[in-house]
């Protein structure tokens, strides 16, 4: 693109670039257009121009001069011819001004003997195509602004389109059997009659497998018919056959997506939609014009796609190579950019790119980005509160995070960190320990003081820090069952075509620095492959070549930290299914039988037994408009959820509301003689949740608590010993003691013959693994390789990657050979 410059700037640059050289100053008049141009040459001659550059050749202008009218031509007027000297500055400036006036804001500088001329312009214009660009403004480089956003995808970089593979997931089925997913199995409905009529033209019917229906017929079924289709009069109960238009399955789905005001309708249509890269901007989110502006051969999207450490190197390169005039303008901007990049590097985020979507960031990554922002602001006398900033951070980067927090403190601020990380506790100036246990047995300050003082106390936290309590390394690693699942050629995100073997019947821990490819391998490749196989999941796995050994397991379960329910009505009792058993128990009581109560009577979700004032919620919601909603206990049932008649039915003196208010520990004692109920609530107790209430709202449970409720549900089921469990950083939010309990539960699952795969940074989990898979060596583009696979002891011996350095001292402390 031509430089947008003023006459003086063009003159100054010429003085530097072509000093001492003979040049022609040209005014462009015609660019790649046909015509004889006799009038143009005559006009130039009358204005006093003696020479013209015609199609690259300097010619004298003569009377009646003309060109071949059927060929494309380039014509420039020769405004001046001179050898550039310092004393000619005023002459150059005037000639440039004249050339720009004649050339519509453009001037060309041609060195004597050269074939190509350099073009300058007052406007931003491509000298070859003649395309002009508006002057750049900040909004032009923002995909959140109409000035910059790609008009096709509105700046999202992606567009939704109907996926035929989701509409027809199995073409071996017939339409009658439900081969077209949006329609389901055959029903006596108009759309099936229409399709039947279309197929009859090809001597086919609804029971023909879709794979045997010719392409033309499928095209009509999916995208509509140009002709009206005939419906037999018997089907529509009319005196004559009925003819109607048929728009096709795809058109119907499009209308639901675009026009349906019902959220349920859109949600239904979403399952047949795939998100693809925008074909206009190719995922870059900006207009073509915005992407035409480049600095050091990179447009803004290319710069935004760089990892943070690559961005640092690019900034240094730009500053070194910018011309002096531009370098002066850019110096302060680059200085500020480098400062912000350094802060991001200091908190261990070197593997992130600037265009990484915030929704894909972990909680720890989001906190560390905000932390980097605060360090950069250089504020003082501020109280900072951080909740587990070490989430998702490898031990290698812990020290950098600690240094960043200390830097905030040293500026004159106070930093309060809610954290379970041992390094963070030992580095603290002051520790406040809350306990002594969880739930109703917690809520007290059991210690406050320095870490050194804490080591002398006997709180649970102190005992783990001073070594009196510990999560022990197992004496032997499991051999497994000899079977495997193997992925070949995984290339999703930063994976470098890795082949990974997962031995079954073992506790497998996947390690590696942040951004090394752990989640891509497990959550984005392995799990979707297995979910598609077992549950016909619509989520597509990341690219891979092949997988072996799926037949060696019978199901896959992802035990994550997402809530067990989205509304306050869901609770541990409903999630585990024990509430159905409790209701059945109440239905069998003599009082309930006399009154004719059914199980629905003891449900707070349906009419009959619930309090109708609060609809079984136990509280009323007061909307506060611009403030968070306020919840107050129901004035009728006083939070018990049920009406008076339902609460009159009691088991061992307790109503259904009393039982929901019991802790798990209390419920275990209460139902000790009811095996069916005891089995499920005992599982909750075994995962360390004895302190929560049976009817505690799911919205009040932490991520770790929700995860353990899910684990308890799995434990209470009868399994075949062929299940694969996947957990992503299950220790998030967990104390040492919670981790011990969690790992005991997971070990029990493996002891039954199942396989557990954990993505984890916590060394107390890593040291318990039967098998380690270490990804790396770095994050982002520097990662994606399989560094190691084997036992923890073998990892320490081979000394590959970073994880072994932190694992070795723990194995040594436990007496395990290194």
Role assignments for model-derived ranges:
Residues 2-11, 15-16:
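Single conserved hydrophobic/aromatic residue that forms the stacking wall/gate
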Residues 12-13, 17-818:
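Conserved phosphate-binding elements of NTP-dependent enzyme cores
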């Amino acid at each position: 693109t031509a430089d947008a410059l003023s006459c003086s700037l063009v003159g100054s640059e010429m003085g530097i670039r072509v000093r001492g050289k003979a040049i022609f100053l040209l005014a462009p008049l015609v660019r790649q257009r046909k015509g004889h141009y006799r009038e143009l040459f005559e006009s130039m001659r009358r204005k006093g121009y003696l020479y013209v550059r015609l199609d690259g050749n300097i010619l004298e202008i003569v009377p009646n001069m003309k060109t071949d009218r059927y060929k494309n031509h380039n014509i420039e007027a020769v405004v001046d011819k001179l050898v550039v000297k310092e004393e000619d500055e005023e002459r150059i400036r005037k000639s440039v001004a004249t050339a720009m006036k004649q050339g519509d804001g453009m001037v060309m500088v041609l060195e004597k003997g050269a074939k190509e001329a350099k073009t300058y312009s007052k406007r931003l214009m491509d000298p070859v195509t003649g395309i002009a660009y508006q002057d750049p403004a900040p909004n032009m480089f923002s995909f959140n602004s109409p000035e910059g956003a790609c008009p096709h995808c509105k700046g999202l970089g992606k567009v939704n389109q109907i996926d035929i593979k989701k509409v027809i997931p199995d073409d071996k089925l017939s339409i009658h059997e439900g081969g077209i997913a949006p329609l389901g199995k055959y029903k006596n409905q108009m759309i099936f009659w229409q399709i039947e009529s279309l197929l009859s033209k090809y001597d086919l019917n609804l029971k023909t497998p879709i794979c045997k229906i010719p392409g033309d017929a499928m095209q009509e079924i999916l995208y509509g018919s140009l002709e009206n289709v005939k419906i037999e009069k018997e089907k529509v109960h009319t005196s004559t056959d009925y003819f109607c238009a048929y728009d096709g399955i795809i058109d119907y789905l499009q209308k639901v997506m675009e026009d349906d005001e019902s959220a349920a309708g859109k949600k239904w249509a979403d399952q047949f939609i795939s998100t693809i890269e925008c074909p206009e901007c190719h995922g870059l989110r900006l207009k073509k014009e915005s992407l035409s502006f480049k600095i050091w051969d990179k447009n803004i999207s290319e710069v935004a796609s760089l990892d943070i450490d690559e961005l640092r190197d690019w900034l240094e390169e730009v500053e070194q190579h910018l011309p002096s005039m531009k370098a002066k303008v850019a110096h302060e901007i680059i200085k500020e950019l480098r400062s912000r990049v350094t802060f991001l590097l200091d908190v261990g985020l070197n593997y992130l790119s600037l265009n990484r979507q915030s929704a894909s960031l972990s909680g720890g990554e989001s906190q560390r980005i905000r932390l980097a922002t605060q360090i950069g602001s250089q504020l003082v006398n501020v109280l900072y509160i951080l909740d587990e900033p070490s989430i998702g951070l490898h031990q290698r980067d812990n020290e950098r995070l600690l240094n960043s927090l200390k830097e905030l403190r040293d500026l004159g601020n106070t930093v309060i960190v809610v954290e379970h990380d041992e390094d963070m506790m030992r580095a603290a100036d002051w520790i406040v320990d809350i306990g002594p246990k969880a739930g109703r047995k917690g809520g007290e300050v059991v210690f406050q003081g320095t870490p050194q003082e804490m080591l002398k106390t006997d709180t649970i936290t102190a005992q783990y820090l001073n070594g009196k309590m510990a999560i022990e390394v197992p004496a032997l690693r499991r051999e497994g069952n000899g079977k495997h699942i193997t992925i070949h050629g995984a290339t999703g995100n930063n994976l470098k075509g890795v082949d990974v073997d997962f031995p079954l019947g073992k506790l497998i821990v996947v390690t590696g620095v942040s951004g090394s490819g752990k989640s891509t391998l497990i959550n984005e490749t392995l799990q979707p492959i297995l979910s598609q196989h077992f549950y016909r999941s619509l989520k597509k796995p990341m690219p891979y070549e092949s997988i072996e050994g799926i037949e060696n397991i019978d199901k896959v379960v992802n035990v994550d930290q997402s809530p067990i329910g989205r509304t306050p009505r869901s609770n541990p009792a409903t999630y585990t299914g024990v509430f159905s058993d409790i209701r059945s128990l109440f239905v069998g009581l003599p009082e309930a039988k006399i009154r004719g109560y059914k199980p629905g009577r003891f449900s707070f979700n349906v009419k009959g037994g619930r309090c109708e004032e609060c609809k079984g919620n136990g509280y009323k919601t007061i909307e506060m408009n611009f403030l968070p909603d306020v919840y107050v206990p129901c004035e009728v049932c006083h939070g018990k959820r049920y009406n008076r008649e339902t609460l009159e039915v009691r088991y061992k003196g307790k109503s259904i509301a009393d039982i929901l208010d019991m802790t798990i520990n209390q419920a275990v004692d209460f139902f000790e003689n009811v095996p069916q109920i005891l089995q499920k609530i005992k599982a909750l107790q075994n995962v360390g949740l004895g302190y929560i209430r049976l009817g505690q709202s799911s919205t009040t449970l932490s991520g770790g608590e929700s995860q353990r409720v899910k684990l308890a549900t799995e434990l209470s089921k009868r399994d075949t010993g062929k299940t694969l469990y996947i957990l992503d950083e299950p220790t998030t939010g967990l104390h040492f003691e919670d981790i011990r309990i969690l790992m005991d539960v997971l070990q029990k699952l493996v002891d039954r013959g199942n396989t557990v795969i954990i993505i984890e940074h916590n060394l107390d989990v890593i040291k318990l693994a039967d098998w380690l898979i270490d990804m790396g060596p770095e994050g982002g583009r520097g990662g994606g390789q399989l560094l190691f696979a084997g036992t923890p002891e073998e990892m320490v011996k081979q000394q590959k990657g970073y994880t072994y350095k932190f694992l070795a001292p723990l194995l040594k402390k436990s007496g395990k050979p290194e």
